[in-house]
Amino acid sequence: MSFHLDYLLALPGVRVETCTQVEEKIFLGLSILSKGIVCHHCKNPTGKLHQARPILVRDLSVFGRPVYLKIPRRQFYCPTCQRYPTERIDFLDVKRRHTQRYEQNIYERVKQSNMEQIVREEGLNYDKIKGIFEQVKKNRIGNGLNEFVSMR
């Protein structure tokens, strides 16, 4: 697509291939720049793509419009250990459907106001907002403990 969209999106390791608007929502089709991964199981590199299924991930809004990223979820075959590791994406936590920066934004906004207001603003249900808030809070506590241990 355009260097400008890649620059504005500012997510590592991806390129914007398509940009479409449906009603009030913006959809960005992304491609991943890396050709392979390091297997999570045996730590050997592999570039043998087994399958790629797209997932839809919510990102920060732009100009008051919600943004969704269509990301290929790639699974590779590792000939060394004969397993099928799924590629990890830097800006997306495992089994999450929102970018880390979107979840961080929700967390900060809930701290400043309340969940009901964020539910109205984002168009998500209460349980989803609460789940995002609790997940970010849990990650922060875990990171805080790790920092504390490393200081000792």
Predicted regions and their residues:
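Short, positively charged, Gly/Tyr-enriched micro-motifs
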Residues: K43, R58-R152
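Short, conserved DNA-binding cores of transcription-related domains
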Residues: M1-R83, I89
